[in-house]
């Protein structure tokens, strides 16, 4: 995947608010570990080569531990996780055509990743 330009600052702001960041991606584990390092995200919270069902499992496990979960994603492969999160956010920053079906499955649609900062959940 592509790293959005504002993601580093966005992650820092969220972390400063005490929000724990988890990454679940279909990308290679090595790439996700590197991303976690760049973003200063705990590597134990970074999961690579994750299927759509796997993303859903991550969301469910976090909720089972008492976390309130905001799922941010950008594609149809995120729908299962969106459906299980407390708040689902679709980012359309990737500039690909987005399915109306996908838009209808989310609580929020954002143009820039930094917009998650203003979502109260």
What annotation goes with each model-predicted range?
Residues 1-20:
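Short, acidic loop-to-helix structural element flanking the phosphoryl-transfer center
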Residues 3-6, 29-33, 97-98:
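Cytosolic catalytic headpiece of P-type ATPases
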Residues 13, 35, 61, 80-81, ...:
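Hydrophobic/aromatic ligand-binding patch that stacks against planar heteroaromatic rings
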Residues 16-20, 62-69, 86-87:
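Short beta-strand/loop segments at the ligand-binding rim of alpha/beta enzyme cores
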Residues 25-29, 68-108:
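Acidic, Mg2+-coordinating phosphoryl-transfer loop and its flanking beta/alpha structural elements
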Residues 29-68:
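Substrate-recognition "cap/lid" segment bordering the active-site pocket of phosphatases
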Residues 44-50, 107-115:
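Short acidic-hydrophobic, aromatic-tinged amphipathic segments that line or gate anion-handling sites
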Residues 53-59, 98-106, 119-121:
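Short, charged, surface-exposed secondary-structure boundary motifs
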């Amino acid at each position: 995947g592509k790293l959005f330009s504002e993601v580093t600052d966005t992650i820092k702001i969220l972390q400063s608010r005490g929000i724990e960041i988890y990454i679940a991606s279909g990308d290679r584990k090595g790439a996700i570990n590197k991303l976690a390092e760049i973003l200063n995200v705990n590597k134990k919270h970074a999961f690579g080569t994750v299927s759509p069902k796997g993303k859903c499992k991550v969301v469910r496990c976090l909720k089972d531990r008492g976390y309130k979960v905001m799922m941010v994603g950008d594609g149809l492969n995120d729908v299962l996780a969106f459906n299980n999160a407390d708040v689902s956010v679709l980012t359309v920053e990737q500039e690909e055509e987005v399915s109306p079906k996908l838009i209808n499955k989310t609580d929020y649609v954002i143009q820039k990743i930094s917009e998650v900062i203003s979502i109260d959940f």
